[in-house]
Structures are given as C-alpha cells and as structure tokens.
C-alpha cells in the first residue's frame, strides 16, 4: 500500500491536486490533499506517531515550495531523525539569491538554512553566490539536519545556457536511497546526465547533473585514500564516499 498526502496552503491548489489524485488512484488507496502548511502537517504527523509509539513506515517528502519559506531546517531535522525517511527539496536559488540581503527575508532565510552563515554570500554575485548558497544548504542538511547522503541536481533555465533555474536536493540516511534516486533521475534522461522537461523539445533540455570530470574524480579519490589512517579500506566504504 502507498499512502500519499499532498499539502498546500492554497485551497484552490488543494482542490486541483485532489482531483488529480482521484483520477489516478486506480486501486482506491489513501491519497488525499490537505489544506494546511508543511510545518503544521509534519509536526502533527510526527507528534501523533510519537505519542502512540507507532512504527514509522518509509517516508518520502517532496518539498516543492513557492519561494524559500515554510520548511525550516529544524523541521527537516525532525524528519531525518527516522532512518527510513528521504527528502527531495526544490531549492529556489533564484529567489534566495535575489533576496539574500533583504531585511524582510532575513528571518525566513535563517530558518531555511538553520544558520546566519548565508550572509557570507552577500558580497558575491552571479554563479558564485548561487554556488555558496547551495553548498551551505547541502552542508546544513548533513550537519544540522542529520542527512548522511546529500545529492544536488541542477536544473538550468531553458534557453539561457547553464544559468540555474533551481536545484533539486536529495537527502537521506542510507546509501541505497541515494543510489535509487540518482539512478532514477538519470533514467529520465534521453542523453547522459541530461533531463528533458515535460513539454519542452529536445533543443531546450534542462541540465540534470552538474558536469563531472573523470580525471578530477580520480584525483579526489586518490587524495581521500592518501589521507586515510587505515591500511585496508573496504570497497563499500569507498563506494559510499564516491557515489
């Protein structure tokens, strides 16, 4: 059985989503759209499960916000306390970069990152600012929220070269979750390391994976092994680090 809970704070979106779920729910499973906020829904759900001592089934959270507020790092930490949970976050880097220094956005950005360190990117511009923001968010998912594996997927703006439109960030606590997500995203591509958005012709494909040099990867692996204290390193350990 697969349970789907769709969450939106806009009643019109809830009605549209519920109609879509109903049209696809062939096996009459529990698929429903709720009119609430992500924060309220998550805290209510985990509060209920903790109170009754229920065993938590595997959970996959796709967080697709309008903007950059409403999904605090502290809330993601609560989700990732459970071993069989995954996060897939649409990080709207354009909006974040645009309002990085705005006073009205300061509190929301601090909640988003779980730190004030986002301000360190204030003096940067363009790709450098975006790279700093994404890097900080990924590190915070690991160090503040408790994800063991984090993978970013860059989606570029159609017709604007490598200018990122947003980043999809996957966080989990198990290597298998990372493998399945990375392999699944790659299978959606018609070319190596590319993603074709629905409704766009092949000439307007969106980049899925950031370019990766094999030579650079070899150098990174060599540096990792040279700095290792053990004489023998299990292959699984190297795979988990490099994947």
Locate the predicted segments by residue:
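Class I S-adenosyl-L-methionine-dependent methyltransferase catalytic core
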Residues: 1-243
């Amino acid at each position: 059985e697969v349970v789907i809970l769709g969450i939106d704070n806009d009643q019109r979106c809830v009605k549209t989503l519920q109609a879509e779920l109903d049209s696809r729910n062939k096996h009459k499973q529990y698929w429903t759209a709720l009119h609430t906020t992500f924060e309220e829904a998550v805290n209510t759900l985990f509060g209920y499960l903790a109170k009754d001592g229920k065993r938590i089934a595997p959970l996959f959270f796709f967080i697709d916000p309008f903007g950059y507020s409403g999904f605090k790092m502290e809330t993601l930490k609560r989700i990732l306390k459970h071993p069989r949970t995954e996060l897939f976050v649409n990080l709207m880097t354009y909006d974040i970069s645009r309002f990085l220094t705005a006073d009205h956005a300061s509190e929301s950005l601090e909640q988003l990152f779980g730190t004030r360190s986002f301000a360190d990117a204030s003096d940067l511009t363009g790709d450098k600012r975006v790279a700093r923001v994404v890097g900080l968010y990924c590190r915070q998912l690991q160090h503040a929220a408790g994800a063991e594996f984090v993978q970013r997927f860059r989606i570029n703006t159609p017709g604007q070269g490598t200018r990122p439109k947003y980043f999809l960030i996957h966080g989990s606590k198990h290597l298998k979750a990372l493998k399945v997500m990375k392999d699944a995203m790659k299978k959606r591509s018609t070319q190596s390391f590319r993603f074709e958005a629905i409704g766009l012709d092949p000439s307007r494909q969106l980049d899925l994976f950031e370019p990766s040099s094999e030579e650079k990867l070899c150098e990174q692996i060599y540096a990792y092994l040279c700095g290792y204290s053990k004489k023998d390193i299990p292959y699984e350990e190297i795979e988990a680090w490099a994947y």
